[in-house]
Design a protein with these regions (language model features):
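Active-site-adjacent segment of FAD-dependent monooxygenases/related oxidoreductases
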Residues: 1-89, 103
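A conserved short coil-to-beta-strand element within the FAD-binding core of flavoproteins
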Residues: 95-110, 114-116
């Protein structure tokens, strides 16, 4: 699950009034830093790179880019803060719920959902539909929206494998 909270997200948390509360549960930006590549948890270090703008080379870019820094706050810790704040503003939530489809009209949107625990399908009427369903967004596809531009400059893939390399 997600854990690095970028500067744009921090700006949103500030706008929502929950930046300070979020910091209480996070690893602060100044304690973030190196990404290590090792043969095991205590094994040989293969590579160390500065990350998240904490090195001298990039920190200024990050500081100029936003009034907010980054933090490392795992999704299971930030979600309750966001849910509590939204509930205090009148929002309701349905966990273990899958988006199925939606129909938009001039007054809002009707969203079809399925309770993943019971299998029950039901409709919810809303003013807005916000899709936070990831890179292969069904909401985005169903709305007929296209993502333009290039992917980020770099991608990350973590691979763990075991192999007998003793003959080498």
């Amino acid at each position: 699950r997600a854990h690095i909270t970028n500067q744009r997200t921090m700006e949103v948390l500030r706008d929502l009034g929950i930046e300070e509360e979020s910091h209480r549960y996070a690893t602060p930006w100044e304690h973030m830093g190196d990404s290590l590549f090792t043969t095991s948890l205590a094994g040989e270090e293969l590579l160390r790179i500065r990350a998240w703008g904490t090195g001298d080379e990039r920190k200024g870019d990050y500081i100029q880019g936003s009034p907010c820094g980054l933090m490392d706050l795992p999704q299971p810790l930030i979600e309750p803060i966001i849910f509590k704040n939204a509930a205090e503003r009148g929002a309701t939530f349905a966990c273990n719920t899958e988006y199925l489809s939606h129909v938009q009209d001039a007054d809002g949107v009707t969203v079809m959902l399925q309770d993943r625990l019971t299998g029950r399908e039901y409709a919810v009427r809303a003013k807005y539909l916000y899709g936070a369903d990831g890179a292969r967004s069904k909401v985005l596809d169903d709305a007929g929206l296209k993502v333009e531009g290039q992917l980020a400059r770099a991608g990350t893939a973590y691979v763990i494998f075991k192999a007998d390399l003793s003959r080498y």
